[in-house]
Swiss-Prot record:
Pfam family, one: GatC
Class in the EC hierarchy, top level: ligase
Keyword Glycosyltransferase in annotation: no
Gene name per UniProt: gatC
Stored Gene3D superfamilies: Glu-tRNAGln amidotransferase C subunit, N-terminal domain
Functional description taken from the UniProt entry: Allows the formation of correctly charged Asn-tRNA(Asn) or Gln-tRNA(Gln) through the transamidation of misacylated Asp-tRNA(Asn) or Glu-tRNA(Gln) in organisms which lack either or both of asparaginyl-tRNA or glutaminyl-tRNA synthetases. The reaction takes place in the presence of glutamine and ATP through an activated phospho-Asp-tRNA(Asn) or phospho-Glu-tRNA(Gln).
GO biological process, one term: regulation of translational fidelity
Protein's name according to its UniProt entry: Aspartyl/glutamyl-tRNA(Asn/Gln) amidotransferase subunit C
Amino acid sequence: MIDTEQVKKIAHLARLEITPEQEEQFTGQLSSILEYFDQLSELDTTDVPPTTRAIEIKNITRSDSMQPYPSREELLKEAPEQEGDFFKVPQILNTDEE
């Protein structure tokens, strides 16, 4: 189905350097993959509607709910830097006026 020359060309286009052993290995692997696609193309899909997924899925998310943290002090202890009762974070916006 695919020969070593085609594998060499694919490797060249992908800018891959492969050994002769890898050429043989990839020739066999790519031939198997292409044979599988041939088998799939023989399936009768006339009554199968086009789809992008095999199963219908939806984005399942949980609702957000606020819950108080048991200990504010313990939470602040975990911060790399703090200022009073707040986390101190690096400044990301330039506040210098020009």
